[in-house]
Amino acid sequence: MNTDVRIEKDFLGEKEIPKDAYYGVQTIRATENFPITGYRIHPELIKSLGIVKKSAALANMEVGLLDKEVGQYIVKAADEVIEGKWNDQFIVDPIQGGAGTSINMNANEVIANRALELMGEEKGNYSKISPNSHVNMSQSTNDAFPTATHIAVLSLLNQLIETTKYMQQEFMKKADEFAGVIKMGRTHLQDAVPILLGQEFEAYARVIARDIERIANTRNNLYDINMGATAVGTGLNADPEYISIVTEHLAKFSGHPLRSAQHLVDATQNTDCYTEVSSALKVCMINMSKIANDLRLMASGPRAGLSEIVLPARQPGSSIMPGKVNPVMPEVMNQVAFQVFGNDLTITSASEAGQFELNVMEPVLFFNLIQSISIMTNVFKSFTENCLKGIKANEERMKEYVEKSIGIITAINPHVGYETAAKLAREAYLTGESIRELCIKYGVLTEEQLNEILNPYEMTHPGIAGRK
């Protein structure tokens, strides 16, 4: 007989479980059925599952459904899960069939077996403390798993919001630093009219501020939880008093202003609150990818590109070209954006795929949503510290572009008319002569007038340059 294992059984039969393991037979079945991604459950979701199980045990004790001795051991075991002590025991793949039953049962089994151990009983002695009858009392996967995900997503969103605020503030600092730096504005990747580098960076900061607000606003619908809905939202096997009490405990232990959804069937059927979050994340990454593209273009060179800004050198850029340095931080921002776009499509498809009283595709939906939030938080932290803070302006190069640009003819347009200005611009392009030289050559404007009109700083705010 193998003494390194214990035997657990369910209505499908028996399974060998490693003797030291806190998970049980249903977790083992899940690992056999779903070796899909190679990933484990996110630590924040494990913590949230602990909060759900602790809150449920306390509420069930308060309404007289759960034996107090059993309940106290469940609470102690759940506290250890919340602390992250047993993260290594959560071994199921996050993408799975069954609407999250395997994740829920992984939590139930770990908490039950640890509670048994604390009680002085052998793991697997479910006649004393059962994963289903005790740890999962008054619950279904269909309310426990989404509620845990709401808590995890809210916690991760708060981290993302703080990180994004920090990045936004650093963009504003750069806007102030570059407030007097003149450069050429571009439309269609062609020279347009002068702009201040600080104006560009402030525009970046402002769009990020809107993203912060958009993301923050999505939290409101996540505060509505369906705990107590049980299987289909009707609350079967959940005492009405339990629903109220468990919601209070969940709000207390999670630190979020959670409330019971007004209509539990609606809250169990529908997943629009997650697609709303994902949409806000996608919009944010659309904006961040655009900013990353701008930075890569401005930093192109250093000799044969724009070379308007200098990004911090983070690592050698080529295994064959000595001395080459690449814009790796904007590049990783682009790649995170692409991942978030793909995740959003998955979330959209999964959200649409629900039928009747439950969306069974929630595991892939939650996996992608949590991944999007996590990788955005990570990339914003790294980008801010390793790139944004160290960006330098190549002021001489930008000034040279402005002075050589034909785009400044736009400022002359109100003084000489569009047709004359267009002829001057065309000749400047063909001959290489400057706009200033051609204006003097043809007597279109005087030197004094040109000094006022062609002051590039006068072109960076509303008004007609040279008109007092």
Curated annotation (Swiss-Prot):
pH dependence of function: Optimum pH is 8.5 at 30 degrees Celsius and 7.5 at 60 degrees Celsius. Free AspB is very stable between pH 6 and 9, keeping over 80% of activity after 24 hours, and much less stable at pH 5 and 10.
Gene name of the record: aspB
Provenance organism: Bacillus sp
Uses in industry and biotechnology: Aspartase is mainly used in the synthesis of L-aspartate, which is used in the pharmaceutical industry, parental nutrition, food additives, and is one of the principal ingredients for the manufacture of aspartame, a low-calorie sweetener. Aspartase from Bacillus sp. YM55-1 has several characteristics ideal for application in industrial processes: high specific activity, relatively high thermostability and no cofactor dependence.
Effect on the protein upon substituting residue 101 to S: 80-fold decrease in catalytic efficiency
Protein name, as recorded: Aspartate ammonia-lyase
Phenotype upon changing residue 320 to A: 50-fold decrease in catalytic efficiency
Binding-site residues, L-aspartate: 101, 140-142, 187-188, 319, 324
Temperature dependence: Optimum temperature is 65 degrees Celsius at pH 7.5. Thermostable. Retains 80% of its activity after a 60 minutes incubation at 55 degrees Celsius.
